[in-house]
Amino acid sequence: MRLIQNMCTIAEYPAPGSTAADCCLGAAGRRLVKIAVVGASGVGKTALVVRFLTKRFIGDYERNAGNLYTRQVHIEGETLAIQVQDTPGIQVHENGLSCSEQLNRCIRWADAVVLVFSITDHKSYELISQLHQHVQQLHPGTRLPVVLVANKADLLHVKQVDPQLGLQLASMLGCSFYEVSVSENYNDVYNAFHVLCKEVSPKQQPSSTPEKRRTSLIPRPKSPNMQDLKRRFKQALSAKVRTVTSV
């Protein structure tokens, strides 16, 4: 899979035929793949999405912004339009999983789901089984493609979840598993999305097919400016250089 350079970040799911849709989805007839990234708060969902789409790690993100990112990818000889929906963190209460209607709409909208937990947070791992069941319940009669991602693999000194547990869980759920460090390794992040796109793409209709859902998936999400992301990345890089120089 090869990422194509132009990328859009949009606050609402664009109506087909609109300027935003033309910008983000490209030429008519290109298949559209819609992916929702879901997990507990603080596991690195936004960082994972931005890393995949830009190859960069900034390290400073606004939590629970609920942004919808769009770009084109080239996979096995075909150019796809891919939309990745970042979602607010899921809360767990005594009565079980607490999913807002906005989150449910995102999951129903998606063609595939990335389930994310952090190796530094065992509760985020425990949440995955319930979350996977909830995802499948929102897609009755079909088995939605899913990939399981364990993030923060570089933080071994505070690890609470061993890789073997992730593998066992993925085997039980019937999905692929990747342990990644979003901050240090782009290739593992790339591979996780690559596998998911391969599972989804043969089944999808061209992006010119009218979409029933034209409303915002999450009300009034704040759409980050990509120039601002680049600026913050440069600032973070400059700060690291100054630190090394002063030592």
From Swiss-Prot:
SMART domains registered for this protein in UniProt: RAB (SM00175), RAS (SM00173), RHO (SM00174)
Small GTPase-like, as annotated region: 28-245
Gene3D superfamilies referenced in this protein's UniProt entry, alphabetically: P-loop containing nucleotide triphosphate hydrolases
Keyword field contains Metal-binding: no
EC numbers on record: 3.6.5.2
GO biological process: negative regulation of transforming growth factor beta receptor signaling pathway
Region (Disordered), start-end ranges: 202-228
GO molecular function annotations of the record: G protein activity; GTP binding; transforming growth factor beta receptor binding
Pfam families: Ras (PF00071)
Binding site for GTP: 39-46, 86-93, 151-154
Domain of life: Eukaryota
Keyword annotations from UniProtKB, A to Z: GTP-binding, Hydrolase, Nucleotide-binding
Similarity-based family: Belongs to the small GTPase superfamily. Ras family.
Name of the featured protein: Ras-like protein family member 11B
